[in-house]
Structures are given as C-alpha cells and as structure tokens.
C-alpha cells in the first residue's frame, strides 16, 4: 500500500460532523478501507464485526471508512490486525479524508486527477467512476500517479451522492 506524501491521518476534516462507529475487525485491513458489517457474525459485547466491503463495483452502501489506531501509536500506513477493536468514520458531504484508491483494469499505473469522481470497488477500495454506478461517494482532491492494485491512500472529498 502506498500513500499520499502530505498526510499522516485518515480523517483530514478539522471539525468532523459525520458519525464515528466502533467495532471488531474480521480480517486485517489498512486504514482508508471502506467497511461493512459481517452479517455472518453475531455482535460481541454489543459490537458488530466488520470486514472490507464486498459489494460489486458502484453499488450503494453505507460509507464507513476505517481509521488508523492512533491510540496505540499506529499511523494510516500501518495495517490493523484481525480481531482488533476498530474505529470508522461515516463522512458527510464536504468532509475530506484519505481513502484507498486502487488501479482498475490491469492493476498498476492508473492516475487520478483533481476532480475525478470515485466509485466503490470490491475489497473496500475505490476506483475511477465507470458505467452507471448507484453511488459516487468521493471526488479526488490531489493528483496521484502510479495508483496500485492494492490501494493508494488518496486525498478525497465526500460528495454525498
């Protein structure tokens, strides 16, 4: 996983007004991943288990972006191990954050320009919009080159769509 050189935290908005969620991580993930409730696992101590989003590209779903675990000294480039307690953030329009953007097609070398619109991809990442998606949740806020298939943390703004 590579990342934007200018930031070291997922949530960039200074006074976030979206919703913070907590849960338990099913399998290891990097911060910036879009998460979903693992419907096959009952809540543990009142907390749901979460996994990387598995929906088909472009489908509508709750946006819950995995945050870094700064309370134990982790950064947004540190993978979070499975079965750890996690925090996520559900952005509102205008919120700025870092999300994992992956290369589409061949898997390497994609570039994103400021203003590009992103859609959800399988595996909890986002890709440039294609076709007629149900939801286009983010707009790119920085130019990124050589986006990788495993995901590159990219500065985005939530669109609310």
Annotate each predicted stretch with a short phrase.
Residues 1-161:
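Surface-exposed, low-hydrophobicity beta-strand/loop segments enriched in small/polar/acidic residues
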